[in-house]
Each structure stands twice: as C-alpha cells, then as structure tokens.
Amino acid sequence: MTRIYIATDDELLIASGNNGLWTVGTRLAGLSPRCLAVDPLRPERVYCGTAGHKLWHSADAGASWGAAGAGIAHADVTAVAVSPRERAGAFGVLYAGTEPSALFRSEDGGAWRELQGMRALPSAPTWSYPPRPHTNHVRWITPDVADAARLSVCIEAGALVRSLNGGATWLDRGPDGPLDTHTLLMHPRVPGQLYAAAGDGFDAPGRGYNESRDGGETWERPDEGLEHHYLWSVAADPGDAATIVVSAARSPEAAHAPRNAASAVYRRAGHAPWQQVRDGLPPMEGTTVAVLAANPSEPGVFYAASNRGIYRSADAGITWGRLGAEWPARYQDQRVEALVVTD
C-alpha cells in the first residue's frame, strides 16, 4: 500500500492507495500543518509541524495523532526531519525547526533540547524572511544519509548552515552557497549528493537550482533550459541520481497565490538541459507551485501535489497523470505546504 501525506493550509490529507484504488481522509483540521516527516525505518511513525500548534505525531500511519512538541520553545514548527542513520531505541533521532529560527533535537519523540550554537552563527543577524522581515525561520532540515553526525539546515532567508558533529558546533554559510533554499535533498543512494531548490534565482537568474557532490562544500548551478528561476521543490529519482524534477515560477506571487498562480515543472536527465514537462499536468495558469516527492521504494516514479490535485509520473517525470484520490474543491484556493510518500 502507498500512503501520501499532504499538508494543506487548513488540514492534513492522507491518501492510501492499493492497486489503483484510493481512499482519502483528513486529520488535524484547523491546526495549519506546515511540514511533514516519516521515520524511514518505521514508516507508521509520522510527524507534522504546524503554525501555532507546535509538533504532532502519529504512531499508526496517521489514523490518530497526539501533541509531541511540549519541549519546543516556539509555537510555529516550520521544518521537521528524522535521521535515517541515527536511532535511539525505537526512535529515529528527530529534528524540528521553528520560527523564529531555532533547532531542536529529540531522541524519544517527546523530550527536546535546543541546539543553541546555530543561533550564534555570525550570519544570524542578517537572516530575514521577506514577507515578515523582522523574523526568519528554519525552512528545511537534511540529515546526512550516510554519516549520522552531519546535518544541513536551511534558513529562510539568509543561510544554508551545516554541522559535522550532530549540532554541537556549526559551519556558517559558505561564500557560494544558496541563501534562500526552499527544499534541500540528499540522494538516498549517493552520499554527499545534494539538490537545492532556491528562491535565489528570483533576484539572480541562474541561481535557483543548486547541486553539490560533496555535502555542501562546493556548489554547481546547471540551469540551461530553465525559464522560471524562482524554484520551490525538487525530487530525485531513487534509482538514478541524475534524473531530477523541480517546480518553479517567475516570482513568489506566481508560485503561491492561487488567483495569480502560474507555475511549471521541469525535468533534467544526466547532463542534458532542463526541459519543461506538461504532459498530464494541469495548465500553468491557476496552478500553485507543486510540491514534489519520490517514494524510496519506487524507482522512476515521482509525485506532485498542488492546488489542482495529486499527480504521479511512472516514467521518471516525462508524463504524468492525476491520481484518482478525491481532491476537495476548497483546496483549489489553498496552497500545498508539504508532501511525503511512503509504503
């Protein structure tokens, strides 16, 4: 069975599919879900960060939920991740990021401690989120797939910072790293291979897509073929690290405001230029920027979710089709905040 978790503006949607038949349910109504994570070794454990209601967790694949953020100092949990390498008993080590920017670690899913060194970095006074310039937040957390001590954290906006020792000390943003990273992934089979979809390209075309082969030490920006430079989401084929899809728009408003939305999905294979993919996807106009995902157990398969519904590609992103899962009409006026797909 495939399970798809989607955080919308108002609630969490869970679609469960088997042999092409889908059932849909909703949870956490009114809690404003913002981010999601699934324990890779225990996929029935799901975590959801919210705006104003801290962190929630489920131990039964989303059927029931309980509060899990009592030790997190801030109400807005904007990023959550589970380490694929480090475990404490039955739990994967859990990280949660907040607004204002702070990073917390838990080894049991409930007791938290802040990794305070991140907030003391020299670049911290310059961090600022443009819609609310007085503050900023942790946008993404990426534990290393091979080294449990390595961790990358993206601040919106202002920095991509790293720790090589589990958060005890931190390396500040590098001179050539992205500053406004929206999604940061490490390929599950290629340690050190990072993909970053960033907003940097809005002001500096050519800097929206970033990739690193050495865990963030250095960066490359292959952008030939990209005509939309404000990048939001990225997913990599679990079976082929060189096949990638990204979602993009010309501006933040075109990405996120349903009434003015105009977004695109691009695909890149190997060293070929990016190509916009349209077959089976909704029209650009009126479609908010998609959140993309891949299921580690499905090589060659990608998923996309936007205000127009849930879409799947079974040919590595070339063609797409809308899933039969029910998509409430009210979602057309909302944005998708997060997407996770698992078995």
Where are these regions (language model features)?
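Extracellular glycan-interacting surfaces
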Residues: 1-343
